[in-house]
């Protein structure tokens, strides 16, 4: 469960390290976002000479959350960290690599490029 002001790690090689959630997209009073949801973020930490700079405002899709996700078969999945992948306006990732596993829920939300780049889909 990601809400406004949550800090997340970045799971791609776009150059950002830490991002800060500004807004959860999808409804005027939507409070929480989970895996597969799109949020608006601000870059808080970035490596030098990268595609993104500190202070940039971008969209990101959540790929891992500490809060468990219930699956339709009754099982749960949770990760050790909250992570996101930065995306462009047409839902394509800004980076060319994804680090760490991603949840299977991204496939249902039509983020096929992120699923194909990920080393593992859980």
Swiss-Prot record:
<dbReference type="InterPro" id="IPR019972">
    <property type="entry name" value="Ribosomal_uL14_CS"/>
</dbReference>
<keyword id="KW-0694">RNA-binding</keyword>
<dbReference type="GO" id="GO:0006412">
    <property type="term" value="P:translation"/>
</dbReference>
<dbReference type="InterPro" id="IPR036853">
    <property type="entry name" value="Ribosomal_uL14_sf"/>
</dbReference>
<dbReference type="Pfam" id="PF00238">
    <property type="entry name" value="Ribosomal_L14"/>
</dbReference>
<dbReference type="GO" id="GO:0022625">
    <property type="term" value="C:cytosolic large ribosomal subunit"/>
</dbReference>
<keyword id="KW-0689">Ribosomal protein</keyword>
<dbReference type="InterPro" id="IPR000218">
    <property type="entry name" value="Ribosomal_uL14"/>
</dbReference>
<comment type="function">
    <text>Binds to 23S rRNA. Forms part of two intersubunit bridges in the 70S ribosome.</text>
</comment>
<protein>
    <recommendedName>
        <fullName>Large ribosomal subunit protein uL14</fullName>
    </recommendedName>
</protein>
<dbReference type="InterPro" id="IPR005745">
    <property type="entry name" value="Ribosomal_uL14_bac-type"/>
</dbReference>
<comment type="similarity">
    <text>Belongs to the universal ribosomal protein uL14 family.</text>
</comment>
<dbReference type="GO" id="GO:0070180">
    <property type="term" value="F:large ribosomal subunit rRNA binding"/>
</dbReference>
<comment type="subunit">
    <text>Part of the 50S ribosomal subunit. Forms a cluster with proteins L3 and L19. In the 70S ribosome, L14 and L19 interact and together make contacts with the 16S rRNA in bridges B5 and B8.</text>
</comment>
<keyword id="KW-0687">Ribonucleoprotein</keyword>
<keyword id="KW-0699">rRNA-binding</keyword>
<dbReference type="GO" id="GO:0003735">
    <property type="term" value="F:structural constituent of ribosome"/>
</dbReference>
